């Protein structure tokens, strides 16, 4: 998928014990739900079809592990619900980029991922996206 100025870039966090990138690959697509933090919900409302997302495992792993694309949403989680969800599909696994690597990188060290560690839907600039891709060796894990 080619980048253009309309594409948004995000990082979504998830505990791998709850739902891992391997689970997403197995399922083929999923509804990204369970986001209740008000700032994360505000960010999720800005996500659009075609936006690119890095999948970040929280907990013990603390690393970017894969890439996703938005294929649906945002829409209400259920009738009358004020929370929104989006639908995502896997693009591919990445060679892990750890939180330690991100904190040590000059371009990424002031990113909301580092500054707001409990935020589960984190916006990214194109430069940040490209830097994480570089740190992963722009390689896909096989």
Predicted regions and their residues:
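Compositionally biased, charged N-terminal/linker segments
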Residues: 1-48, 136-142
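Short, acidic Gly/Pro/Ser/Thr-rich loop/turn segments
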Residues: 17-19, 95, 131
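Hydrophobic beta-strand signal
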Residues: 54-55, 69
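Short, charged beta-turn/beta-strand-edge "cap" motif at the junction between a beta-strand
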Residues: 56-62
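Aromatic- and Lys/Arg-enriched surface recognition patch
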Residues: 65-126
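Charged phosphate-binding loop/patch that engages nucleotide di/tri-phosphates or the phosphate backbone
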Residues: 124-142
């Amino acid at each position: 998928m080619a980048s253009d100025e309309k594409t948004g870039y995000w990082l979504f966090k998830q505990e791998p014990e709850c739902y891992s990138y391997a689970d997403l690959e197995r399922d083929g697509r999923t509804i990204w739900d369970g986001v209740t933090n008000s700032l994360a919900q505000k960010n999720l409302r800005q996500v659009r079809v075609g936006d690119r997302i890095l999948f970040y495992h929280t907990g013990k792993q603390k690393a970017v592990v894969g890439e996703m694309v938005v294929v649906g949403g945002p829409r209400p989680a259920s009738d009358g619900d004020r929370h929104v969800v989006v639908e995502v599909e896997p693009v591919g696994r990445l060679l892990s980029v750890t939180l330690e690597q991100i904190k040590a990188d000059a371009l990424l060290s002031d990113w909301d991922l580092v500054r707001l560690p409990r935020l589960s839907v984190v916006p990214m600039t194109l430069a940040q996206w490209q830097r994480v891709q570089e740190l992963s060796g722009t390689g896909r894990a096989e």
